[in-house]
Regions:
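Glycan-recognition and catalytic cores of secretory/periplasmic carbohydrate-active enzymes
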Residues: 1-244
Length: 244
């Protein structure tokens, strides 16, 4: 990132140059966060690719894909075993619904981008396939672990004991937020229209159920804060774009 300042100050830059450079930074940042940061709960790559045919696991065997991303981590990298990595002791082990739904949406958008490399660059194309498989696992995890018994998505705290290989999550705040559910609706709907697999139709129905719930309680939106309203507008605009 230390080069972005001088880059943007160049007088000869065109809008297209800036857009391309920012896109590169964003996709590489997403790739590092999702596959290498370990800033959250991870899934072994071999487990992720079991259902993916004709996939060379050696390409991504050193990665640790995220099922769910933590709320916060220190961006300063530490050198450990000759590898730069985030300091896991600085992680704030909370799972934010809004952040995780945005992560999955970003993964799906990049998966569509990498689809364009079919027959051109096998490594990039396979990265897109990996993203699709990861998005499915993430959505399965959210539905099973980030909801209350009543089915409401809620932020969680990771209280797992490092001595035991078992994930333990506790509710942090059971307050209902429209924006959380709308972004989750977007993520499930995006998956359903992008892939044609055994779970796609179920995800589409699930996203429609969330939409119906939002419509049934739409009068409550008038009472939310300006910040929450901005997030609601963002989520609804994303959904509208996907529907068209």
């Amino acid at each position: 990132m230390k080069y972005i300042g001088p880059f943007l100050r160049m007088n000869s830059l065109k809008r297209e140059n800036i857009e391309n450079q920012l896109f590169y930074f964003s996709k590489e940042s997403l790739k590092y966060l999702v596959l290498n940061s370990k800033c959250g709960l991870t899934i072994p790559t071999k487990d992720l690719l079991k259902s993916t045919s004709k996939f060379d696991i050696n390409i991504f065997k050193s990665n640790s894909p995220l099922l769910c991303v933590y709320k916060k981590g220190n961006c300063k990298l530490d050198l450990e075993n000759n590898v730069l990595s985030l300091n896991y002791k600085k992680f704030k082990k909370e799972f934010n619904i809004f952040s995780n739904s945005l992560m999955t949406l970003s993964i799906l958008e990049m998966a569509e981008y990498y689809d364009g490399f079919k027959g051109i660059d096998s490594e990039k194309y396979n990265l897109g396939r990996l993203y699709k498989g990861l998005a499915r696992k993430q959505l399965e995890f959210y539905a099973a672990n980030l909801r209350t018994p009543e089915g409401v998505f809620t932020d969680k705290v990771d209280s797992s004991d490092e001595l035991f290989d078992e994930t333990k999550l506790e509710n942090k705040n059971e307050k209902f937020r429209f924006s959380d559910h709308i972004l989750m609706m977007d993520a499930y709907y995006r998956y359903s229209i992008m892939l044609n697999d055994s779970i796609s139709q179920s995800y589409r129905v699930f996203s429609k159920d969330i939409l119906n719930m939002i419509m049934n309680f739409k009068e409550e939106i008038y009472t939310v804060s300006t910040d929450e309203l901005s997030k609601i507008c963002l989520g609804l605009n994303i959904y509208f774009n996907y529907c068209n």
